[in-house]
A protein has these predicted regions:
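A short gly/proline-enriched turn/hairpin at secondary-structure junctions
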Residues: 36-40
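Acidic, metal-coordinating catalytic segment for phosphate/diphosphate chemistry
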Residues: 1-14, 18-20, 92-93
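Entry beta-strands of beta-propeller and related beta-repeat scaffolds
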Residues: 23-24
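Unchanged
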Residues: 42-141
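Charged phosphate-binding loop/patch that engages nucleotide di/tri-phosphates or the phosphate backbone
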Residues: 132-165
Length: 165
């Protein structure tokens, strides 16, 4: 990947939150059929960890007291957003895709703390606890390969975490 392509991927984070049963938090996008993990862009001057904590708080209402980040991917996982799906940054042709750092987090608090209405704009309508591999088949098609690669990469850390639960 050349330097120009790297700059055309929006820096982003994705957070896999695991409950005491080893299930992962899976969220439905507001007014869309699409489901995904909490995710979002990295703001200027922000570290990926800071972005992961901020996005988790904004999207699902959980703060640093509610989750413990146990793993950060070393690599960036990339995906292109299809032209017909591009909005916001993507319609302005600043970015044609996203590069993501992936995080694995353990839920410390009760699931009652999950609040999809915590911040505006609201990102998700609904959430469920899902099996670890469920997202690969349920995410929008253009993210499937990225999810597969990220989940395979994180699997050893997920297995370590769930053995402790």
């Amino acid at each position: 990947m050349n330097l120009l392509e790297q700059k055309e991927y929006r820096p982003n984070v994705a957070v896999i939150i695991v409950n005491l049963s080893g299930k992962v938090l899976w969220c439905q996008r507001k007014q869309h059929d699409g489901w995904q993990f909490p995710q979002g862009g990295i703001d200027k001057g922000e570290t990926p960890v800071e972005a992961a904590l901020r996005e988790t708080k904004e999207e699902v209402g959980l703060d640093e007291h509610d989750i413990e980040i146990v793993y950060e991917s070393q690599q960036w996982f990339r995906y292109k957003v299809p032209k017909e799906k591009r909005t916001g940054y993507f319609t302005k042709k600043i970015f044609f895709g996203q590069k993501q750092k992936w995080f694995l987090a353990r839920l410390l608090s009760d699931e009652n703390k999950i609040d999809l209405n915590a911040y505006r704009p609201i990102e998700f309508d609904k959430w469920v606890w899902a099996n670890y591999w469920h997202p690969i088949n349920a995410v929008v098609s253009f993210k499937k390969e990225t999810y597969r690669q990220a989940l395979l990469s994180i699997l050893p850390e997920y297995n370590k975490l769930t053995k402790k639960l």
